[in-house]
Amino acid sequence: MDAYRAVVDKRDQRVYLPKPIPDEALRRILQAARMTGSSKNREPNRLIVVTEREGVRALAALSEWGRWLAHAAAVIVIAQVEPHEFDAGRCAQNMMIAAWADGIGSCPAHLPEAEVARLLGIPRDVHVNRVIGFGSVDPVRAAAPKSVARRRKPIEELVHRERW
């Protein structure tokens, strides 16, 4: 899948097949994170990869809105000593696009930072910035017609040239 197709076709996925992510696919996801550009080339992102079922389920139990994570094959937490929202967002998007290109679905989740940190043994001076679930998607479900939620505003409504 080329980069453009991966970007425009990607959809958040919260339903996964009950199988692990192949090691090579997970390695590519992590490599995409590692190669993410960062402000002043600081490389602030640190990744905690959770694949053991007990840990994945414990993360899912931290928030009503994160319950779907219980079925993820992996949860990756982006942590930073100094919070850099922009850099964390770039890293998250790189991982999710790389995953989608390999047929792996993903979706960010909002979990309480302090509880994630406690559960994963993250030091007090390190900030939990993003939590993302990953898993193999049903190819039929992934190829289904785009839902109403996936429709986007026309480009003419979003883009202004030269001035507002």
Q: Model-found features: residue ranges?
A:
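Acidic, surface-exposed loops and disordered segments
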Residues: M1-W164
